Swiss-Prot record:
Official protein name in the record: Mediator of RNA polymerase II transcription subunit 4
GO biological process: positive regulation of DNA-templated transcription; positive regulation of transcription elongation by RNA polymerase II; positive regulation of transcription initiation by RNA polymerase II; regulation of transcription by RNA polymerase II; RNA polymerase II preinitiation complex assembly; transcription by RNA polymerase II
GO cellular component entries: core mediator complex; mediator complex; membrane; nucleoplasm; nucleus
Coiled coil: 24-48, 90-131
Gene behind this protein: MED4
Function text: Component of the Mediator complex, a coactivator involved in the regulated transcription of nearly all RNA polymerase II-dependent genes. Mediator functions as a bridge to convey information from gene-specific regulatory proteins to the basal RNA polymerase II transcription machinery. Mediator is recruited to promoters by direct interactions with regulatory proteins and serves as a scaffold for the assembly of a functional preinitiation complex with RNA polymerase II and the general transcription factors.
Organism encoding this protein: Homo sapiens (Human)
Biased composition (Low complexity): 259-270
Gene Ontology molecular functions: nuclear thyroid hormone receptor binding; nuclear vitamin D receptor binding; transcription coactivator activity; transcription coregulator activity
Family stated for the protein in its record: Belongs to the Mediator complex subunit 4 family.
Residues the record lists as N-acetylalanine modifications: 2
Subcellular location: Nucleus
Transcription listed as a keyword: yes
Chain spans, region Disordered: 1-22, 226-270
InterPro entries in the cross-refs: Mediator_Med4
Amino acid sequence: MAASSSGEKEKERLGGGLGVAGGNSTRERLLSALEDLEVLSRELIEMLAISRNQKLLQAGEENQVLELLIHRDGEFQELMKLALNQGKIHHEMQVLEKEVEKRDSDIQQLQKQLKEAEQILATAVYQAKEKLKSIEKARKGAISSEEIIKYAHRISASNAVCAPLTWVPGDPRRPYPTDLEMRSGLLGQMNNPSTNGVNGHLPGDALAAGRLPDVLAPQYPWQSNDMSMNMLPPNHSSDFLLEPPGHNKENEDDVEIMSTDSSSSSSESD
């Protein structure tokens, strides 16, 4: 009778334990199932020992304890499967956490690189905008090449490019002949009709014809017409534009030298 009463108490405890174990973690449920299996196994062994010694135990009570033990063992096996699945899931979670940490590190590195690239691109865009502004400003204030050439000619004609070593501010000397020096020189005297006959550097026929040889003709288009017309007499015609009979090699060399000087003086005076 004591064994039957203990078996009934065990049934009540197991029933209450199953109701409470439903809201616990898997680990607690496994521990509870192990304790129940241990208690049921001990109870079954005691019942078998008593029935063997005294032969007073009823067969129904032994079967009930055995059924409870089998049922509890089935629950324990289910919990073991659940624990294994949860262990696999936990392992996968750990792997995923490591992967997430790695990806997070990669994202931070990429974010750093993107910030650097953004800064570089912002600088490049700013510089490009400034260049576009400069280009637009240059287009609006464009200057023709002729104006630049004229301005360069004025600078070269009115400013020195290489001053003497003893030159000081206010010194009138220049590293090139001034307009006054050019007019008082040999070339300036050649252009003066009153002194052409005295110098004798040009052939007599050319002077008599009232013209300069072709090599002495001005090299600038804006001077050629005016100077040629000034050198021609009123009754001059195009029939006299042939080379003079007295033209020779010596006079040609002198004329070439003087023509070079004439070109330089014309550019400076303009």
